[in-house]
Amino acid sequence: MEYVPKILVDADACPVKAEIKQVAEQFQLEVIFVASFNHYSVNTNGENWIFVDTGKESADMRMMNIANKGDIIVTQDIGLASILLAKGTYVFSNRGELYREEEMSLMLDIRYRHAKERQQGKYSKGPKAMSDQDRSLFKDRITTFLQNK
């Protein structure tokens, strides 16, 4: 029997949960949202949520433990993305960018340099706010990926 991938979502700060649910319904894929207890809600609307303790890497560790080759991951955490790519998963950013292993070294280096600059008091602007166009682009990209898979 062929493995049916699931969608794992690093849900603490994910702005495209609704779009992920729509795509999952369209392709009949299971979605698992992983978040810290800080984001706990009794109203999960029948969705599959896993809540973990509030430790720094708790959600990341849980995602690493339940991800399988072929699964689709949505995260904006580049460190987590690099680890999950090595497991043979497909990792998307919240903006629909499909991460690639060959880009990870450079992306991790840039993240490190930005962290050093912030420590030195050189603050850069964060990412721009998500627009409806960004949400639509995310949905289009992940839909196209699944159609071609």
UniProtKB/Swiss-Prot annotation:
Highest taxon of source: Bacteria
InterPro entries xref list: UPF0178
CDD domains noted in UniProt: PIN_YqxD-like (cd18720)
Pfam families, alphabetized: DUF188 (PF02639)
Protein family according to the UniProt entry: Belongs to the UPF0178 family.
HAMAP family to which the protein is assigned, alphabetical: UPF0178
Full protein name: UPF0178 protein lwe1471
Provenance organism: Listeria welshimeri serovar 6b (strain ATCC 35897 / DSM 20650 / CCUG 15529 / CIP 8149 / NCTC 11857 / SLCC 5334 / V8)
